[in-house]
Amino acid sequence: MLTAMRGDIRAARERDPAAPTALEVIFCYPGVHAVWGHRLAHWLWQRGARLLARAAAEFTRILTGVDIHPGAVIGARVFIDHATGVVIGETAEVGDDVTIYHGVTLGGSGMVGGKRHPTVGDRVIIGAGAKVLGPIKIGEDSRIGANAVVVKPVPPSAVVVGVPGQVIGQSQPSPGGPFDWRLPDLVGASLDSLLTRVARLEALGGGPQAAGVIRPPEAGIWHGEDFSI
């Protein structure tokens, strides 16, 4: 347990530039507290103390705003940033080094027993407000964009955005570590493509063209910003 807790502290410091010291993480990070509370609740759950496990999970929910069923499996160095509103269901499995932002739901589909929640691979990043629903697999090193609704399996190293979630690219690890904070700008790319086609049609038809060229500020990728948070 202590080894896992040290790993959770290290994960918070590595992935959040606002976490300067381990002491601040220990006392001021509800996402870390939620993971710790779940580790205790899951330990009780595995040993058959189901009522105590549910009580521990409920206390953690009241304290942190994070609702993790004690039956869920949470890997090493999982970091829940900003914490509030995260829901993880009973049969969910979360791999190692996963980052989860506020408002994320790893939810079930239907009322049938058995496996009904997602399995999230190692080093996945799930953006704010995303919903991953059903017994699907999210492949290792994938990124789920903010507010995406994912209901189909995701291959490794994929980037998923939209409602319903669509794979629109590959996640590229950054040189300094596994976290590449870039997300494709689908609106900008679509607008750029549309304007290009209109310009070509006007050129073919000899119709009037507006003075100058109207284009989005940058097509394809927004650089230097983290749109997951």
UniProtKB/Swiss-Prot annotation:
Q: Where in the cell is it found?
A: Cytoplasm
Q: Which reaction does it catalyse?
A: L-serine + acetyl-CoA = O-acetyl-L-serine + CoA
Effect of inactivating the gene: Strains lacking this gene are shown to be attenuated in a mouse tuberculosis model.
Q: Looking at its record, which EC class is this enzyme?
A: transferase
User: Listed GO molecular functions?
Assistant: serine O-acetyltransferase activity
Q: Name one GO biological process term.
A: cysteine biosynthetic process from serine
GO cellular component: a single term = cytosol
Where do transmembrane segments lie in this chain? none
Coiled coil (residue ranges): none
Q: What is its EC number?
A: 2.3.1.30
Q: In which pathway does it act?
A: Amino-acid biosynthesis; L-cysteine biosynthesis; L-cysteine from L-serine: step 1/2
Q: Quick one: where is this thing mainly located?
A: cytoplasm
* Signal peptide, first to last residue: none
Q: Which UniProt keywords apply?
A: Acyltransferase, Amino-acid biosynthesis, Cysteine biosynthesis, Cytoplasm, Repeat, Transferase
**InterPro entries the UniProt entry points to:** Hexapep, Hexapep_transf_CS, LbH_SAT, Ser_AcTrfase_N_sf, Ser_O-AcTrfase, Serine_acetyltransferase, Trimer_LpxA-like_sf
| SUPFAM superfamilies in the record | Trimeric LpxA-like enzymes
Q: Which Gene3D superfamilies match?
A: Hexapeptide repeat proteins, serine acetyltransferase, domain 1
Question: What does the protein in this record do?
Answer: Catalyzes the acetylation of serine by acetyl-CoA to produce O-acetylserine (OAS).
What PANTHER family is this protein classified in? SERINE ACETYLTRANSFERASE
More details = Was identified as a high-confidence drug target.
Similarity field: Belongs to the transferase hexapeptide repeat family.
Query: What NCBIfam families does its record include?
Result: cysE (TIGR01172), EPS_EpsC (NF041874)
This one is known as Serine acetyltransferase
Species this protein is from:
Mycobacterium tuberculosis (strain ATCC 25618 / H37Rv)
Top-level taxonomy: Bacteria, Bacillati, Actinomycetota, Actinomycetes, Mycobacteriales
